[in-house]
């Protein structure tokens, strides 16, 4: 009986403690007709500078408003296990401990608006698995880190408005799993609609927020903006421009293209999947299975120029587990695009007949090969195989031969001396059999499409006679490897107008070894291939153009050429070319001898006329300036006998002399004598 009484007292005490309310707060209990209820606590004392610690443990909603609290300490609410709504608004909170919200497993709503937060502990959202509303409005947050994105998937309402954000992570809008299809049978707890508040921030409008800009231009039922009328603050040309009217430069969503969407291949064969993507900035390409799981195959990825990227994934010795869909995903700051390639494995196992150096017919299993894309694989320049080309400074090609159970490949890259360029892949989708030719010509076409042309005895076969299956057989036979043989000291021993003879030293070779000679006009697109016997250690290349420059590489049969196995040479010029230059020089010299004196004579005449023109105009002006008079005084004709018309010239001379001079120096010998004038 005594123990029972003590137990009642303890329970009463604990119940009283659970109902205690801090002096600076008000606690209300709202009951319901069914006997249940919830406790609401409001703390708004302006003198409160610390969080209260003796809150009722059954508190469901806690509001701490308009206080001077500056910090939320670690595990500040850990004992409020029933707390569902936490409002710490319009205080002076500047920092939050990462473990401040520990044990709040029932919390649905967290509002921290109107504080001075410069950062938020995003990882603390893991302590609140049921949180749906996060309000960070009107703080001083400057950025959202990339690490925060994985914690946002369960939020249905996120308000980051009126902060100091200038940008967001490019994948910000991909934080919610509803944007990606959810596999059937998987429980998705993420909300079906997201409400975002992003207005009133000094946004820098570039590719990083291009998805958000595009979102403001369309109506998306899954994502709702609290205020779609957001404006750009930077760069200067977009200052004050609404998102709906902003046009971003150098920002283009990726576009993906595959060479084939369906591939059928025999069991145990090798398959290449190719994917090409364009966009700005240059997109990155990844390969996944249909369930988004990563692939475990060899992938080569290269960007021949800005805004373009290709990728090839190699499936060697495929089996039934390799059948299915493969996704090629291209992604950049502006968005993501994907394409799907379906691989079907046929249950027929065949063994190809290995080719040899003589011409014969061989059978190959049917292979469908498709270039593709994947993760990037870097290749050092020291191990790159080189070949001269004129495609572009940033392009090259590589050819892959497929023969089960392994895939051999080599790269032919354009170079000058020792310059190594980036790699572009020669993609082939071929199967069946063909006859081996002694001389082959590989033609690479622009635009990403590449064909294989075969020449035999110096003449090319018509396109219709060479099927894709034959092309693969020829390409396969060029890749038979003799790993121990090596070519050294390649040199030119003789040159003519239309041919050249090459010689070399060969080490670690067998008696029946063969070598492959690859040559092309320097900078040309046609690549010619011929076989030679290594026992002679020399080969003569005929059919060259006089005065032309060529590049040639000599390597063991099936082994790609290396840098030290290539040489550049020129054929002799035709003598007629020199005579033409001499004739042109003589004609030019003769023309100069004839024309130069004529030009000098014309210049002399022009200068002479220029010098004579000035006195001529002065004489003309003098004639028009002076007036002729018959008499100087208005007397009768009888009185002025001395100034008769017969003396008109003398009157003119008199006008040129001063009056005083005339009167002092004129004398008359007689009445009828001629007067003399002195000036």
From Swiss-Prot:
UniProt xrefs under Pfam families? Ig_3 (PF13927), LRR_8 (PF13855)
Q: Which residues form the Fibronectin type-III domain?
A: 486-574
GO biological processes: gene expression; protein localization; regulation of fibroblast growth factor receptor signaling pathway; response to light stimulus; synapse assembly involved in innervation; synaptic signaling; visual perception
Distribution of this protein across tissues and organs: Detected in the outer plexiform layer (OPL) of the retina where it localizes to ON-bipolar cells (at protein level).
Q: Can you tell me which residues are glycosylated?
A: 296
Give the InterPro entries listed for this entry.
Answer: FN3_dom, FN3_sf, Ig-like_dom, Ig-like_dom_sf, Ig-like_fold, Ig_sub, Ig_sub2, Leu-rich_rpt
Q: How does it sit in the membrane?
A: Single-pass type I membrane protein
| SUPFAM superfamilies attached to this UniProt entry | Fibronectin type III (SSF49265), Immunoglobulin (SSF48726), L domain-like (SSF52058)
User: Which residues form the LRR repeats?
Assistant: 56-79, 80-103, 104-128, 129-151, 152-175
Q: Which residues cross the membrane?
A: 583-603
Q: How is it modified after translation?
A: Glycosylated.
List, alphabetically, the Gene3D superfamilies matched.
Immunoglobulins, Ribonuclease Inhibitor
Chain's role: Plays a role in the synapse formation and synaptic transmission between cone photoreceptor cells and retinal bipolar cells. Required for normal transmission of a light-evoked stimulus from the cone photoreceptor cells to the ON-bipolar cells and ON-ganglion cells in the inner retina. Required in retinal ON-bipolar cells for normal localization of the cation channel TRPM1 at dendrite tips. Seems to play a specific role in synaptic contacts made by ON-bipolar cells with cone photoreceptor pedicles. May also have a role in cone synapse formation.
Protein name, per record: Leucine-rich repeat, immunoglobulin-like domain and transmembrane domain-containing protein 3
Give the species this sequence originates from.
Homo sapiens
- List the lineage, top down: Eukaryota, Metazoa, Chordata, Craniata, Vertebrata
* Gene that encodes it: LRIT3
């Amino acid at each position: 009986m005594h123990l029972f009484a003590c137990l009642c007292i303890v329970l009463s005490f604990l119940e009283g403690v659970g109902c205690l309310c801090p002096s600076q707060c008000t606690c209300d209990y709202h009951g319901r007709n069914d006997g249940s209820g919830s406790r609401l606590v409001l703390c708004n004392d302006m003198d409160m500078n610390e969080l209260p610690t003796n809150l009722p443990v059954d508190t469901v909603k806690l509001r701490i408003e308009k206080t001077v609290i500056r910090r939320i300490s670690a595990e500040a609410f850990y004992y409020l296990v029933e707390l569902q709504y936490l409002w710490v608004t319009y205080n002076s909170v500047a920092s939050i401990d990462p473990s401040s919200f520990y044990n709040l497993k029932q919390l649905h709503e967290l509002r921290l608006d109107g504080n001075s937060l410069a950062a938020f502990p995003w990882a603390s959202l893991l302590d609140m698995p049921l949180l749906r509303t996060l309000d960070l409005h009107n703080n001083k947050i400057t950025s959202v880190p990339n690490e925060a994105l994985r914690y946002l998937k369960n939020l249905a309402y996120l308000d980051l408005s009126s902060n100091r954000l200038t940008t967001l992570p490019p994948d910000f809008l991909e934080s919610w799993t509803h944007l990606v299809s959810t596999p059937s049978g998987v429980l998705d707890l993420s909300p079906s609609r997201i409400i975002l508040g992003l207005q009133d921030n000094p946004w820098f409008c570039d590719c990083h927020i291009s998805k958000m800009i595009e979102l403001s231009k369309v109506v998306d039922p899954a994502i709702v903006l609290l205020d779609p009328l957001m404006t750009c603050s930077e760069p200067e040309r977009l200052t004050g421009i609404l998102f709906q009217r902003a046009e971003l430069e150098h920002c283009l969503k990726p576009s993906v293209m595959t060479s084939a969407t369906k591939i059928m291949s025999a069991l145990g064969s090798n398959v290449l999947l190719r994917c090409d993507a364009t966009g700005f900035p240059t997109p990155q390409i990844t390969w996944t299975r249909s369930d988004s799981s990563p692939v475990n195959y060899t992938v080569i990825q290269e960007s021949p120029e800005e805004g373009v990227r290709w990728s090839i994934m190699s499936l060697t010795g495929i089996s039934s587990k390799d059948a299915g869909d493969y996704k090629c995903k291209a992604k950049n700051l502006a968005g993501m695009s994907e394409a799907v390639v379906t691989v079907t494995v046929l249950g027929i196992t065949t063994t190809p007949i290995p080719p040899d150096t003589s011409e014969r017919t061989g059978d190959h299993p049917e292979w469908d090969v498709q270039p593709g894309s994947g993760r990037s694989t870097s290749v050092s320049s020291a191990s790159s195989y080189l070949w001269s080309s004129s495609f572009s400074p940033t392009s090259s090609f590589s050819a892959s031969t497929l023969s089960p159970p392994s895939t051999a490949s080599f790269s032919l890259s354009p170079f000058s001396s020792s310059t190594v360029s980036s790699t572009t892949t020669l993609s082939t989708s071929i199967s069946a059999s063909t006859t081996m030719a002694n001389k082959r010509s590989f033609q690479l076409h622009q635009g990403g499409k590449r064909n294989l042309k075969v020449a035999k005895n110096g003449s090319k076969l018509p396109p219709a006679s060479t099927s894709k299956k034959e092309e693969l057989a020829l390409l396969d036979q060029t890749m038979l490897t003799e790993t121990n043989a090596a070519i050294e000291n390649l040199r030119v021993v003789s040159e003519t107008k239309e041919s050249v003879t090459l010689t070399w030293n060969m080490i670690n070779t067998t008696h029946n070894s063969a070598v492959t000679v690859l040559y092309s006009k320097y900078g040309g697109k046609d690549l010619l291939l011929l076989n030679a016997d290594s026992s002679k250690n020399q080969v003569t290349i005929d059919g060259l153009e006089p005065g032309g420059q060529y590049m040639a590489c000599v390597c063991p049969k099936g082994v790609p050429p290396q840098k030290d196995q290539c040489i550049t040479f020129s054929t002799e010029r035709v003598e007629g070319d020199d005579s033409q230059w001499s004739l042109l020089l003589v004609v030019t010299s003769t023309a100069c001898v004839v024309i130069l004196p004529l030009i000098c004579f014309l210049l002399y005449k022009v200068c002479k006329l220029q010098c004579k023109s000035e006195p001529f105009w002065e004489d003309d002006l003098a004639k028009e300036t002076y007036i002729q008079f018959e008499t100087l005084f208005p007397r009768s004709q009888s009185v002025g006998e001395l100034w008769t018309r017969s003396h008109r010239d003398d009157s003119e001379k008199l006008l040129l002399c001063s009056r005083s001079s005339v009167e002092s120096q004129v004398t008359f010998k007689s009445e009828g004598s001629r007067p003399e004038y002195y000036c």
